[in-house]
Amino acid sequence: HEPEAQKGLNALTALMMGRGGTASMSYEELTERLNPWSASISAQFDKEMTVLVGEVHRDHLDPFVTILRDLIVTPGFDEADFARNREFLTNSVVSTLRGTDDEELGKETLNALLYAEHPYGVPVNGTEDGLAAIELDDVRAFHAAHYTKGNVIVGVAGGYPDGFVERVELEIVSLLPNGDASPMALPTVSTLDGREVLLVDKDAIATAISIGFPIDVTRADDDFYALMVANSYFGEHRTFNGLLMNKMRGQRGLNYGDYSYIENFIQDGGSRLPVTNIPRRQQLFSIWIRPVPHHNAHFALRQAIRELEVLVNEGLTETEFDASREFLLNYSKLYVQTTSRRLGYHMDSAVYGTAYFIDEIQRRLPSLTVTDVNDAIRRHLQSENLAIAIVTSDAEAFR
């Protein structure tokens, strides 16, 4: 819903609540109030969902809810908060993404190539020009238009008292304005024609590579669970269960790691686990080749594509299937080690219209067969039409 010329408006609006004050309390006063309670309020934003996350000990629940209510319903929209948060987002794009984080730049380059003329094609933090074009009144208007009753999902977990959920509905949700709750229609993702490459030339010490293509599968589809097994075998994030990791790092020592994904993936802090609450109606299959020395970049790209070709053409053996399914049945239990993560997956399941995702993994995977997995691979994965994003020095020579 962001205007084309104001990319970053959603992120900036979210930060005015997650890193801002209320109409009656400055951000500094709010922080001083929360710190003695060991409480926190933060904002997480993606293309289709923004989440305001609050955590507090139950002894301080009553005053905490009042602060949370005021942040959501009547944000302060303070000029100093606006300037600080816009500068934070601008620095994240200019200094971090473009300046020092070649891995993320490679992923965003893949998005730009894969999702041209599409809302997913721009970084969630916005663009330098888009952020510069945003005024405080634009943030106020965006908040009024989209933070409405029909757009809200409330999730509560932990040791809360009886009637607390109803209280949140009454004291927070009911105070929001009415509004259009229908999601924006998404354009069809452009069809790839062969292997399309986008090179970014910068003074990088190594070459970062991301590969991907759109898939018509989300957690709402039965085939998602079969693809979970296939993906765990092929490229489970930051584990040696994945074939890519074993062959490219383990056997050849090309780089730190090589992984694959069947949906948009953001790592949760320093863990190996995915962030919750970033559901999308359109998903992609992707391969992340972490930076490799320039002289090995061509080889790493060719090997990753070759391994994908083998996966598509040959699938998994019975032994590979059994081992990967068993690994995933156990590993997925680690997804919900905290109350916050359990709540996050419950909310994601509500968005996708499914039963609780973690329970579904335990229910569905035991009944899968190797034929189910290989059939799903043939239906949804391929190696001929690929978007390939490369961040490297002397890009012209890479051609």
Task: Pin down the residues of each PLM region.
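Non-catalytic, conformational "gating/processing" segments within enzyme and secreted inhibitor domains
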Residues: 91, 95, 107-108, 136-171, ...
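Short, surface-exposed beta-strand/loop micro-motifs that present aromatic residues
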Residues: 140-145, 194-201, 274-277, 376-379
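Short, conserved secondary-structure transition motifs
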Residues: 56-57, 89-96, 187-201, 326-335
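M16 family metallopeptidases and their MPP-like homologs
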Residues: 1-18, 22-73, 92, 102-129, ...
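Short, conserved charged micro-motifs
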Residues: 62-63, 162-166, 221, 294-299, ...
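An aromatic/glycine/proline-enriched structural segment found at the starts
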Residues: 116, 153-217, 236, 392-399
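A short, acidic, amphipathic alpha-helical segment used as a generic capping/interface helix at domain edges
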Residues: 368-375
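PPIase-associated folding chaperone regions across multiple families
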Residues: 222-230, 244
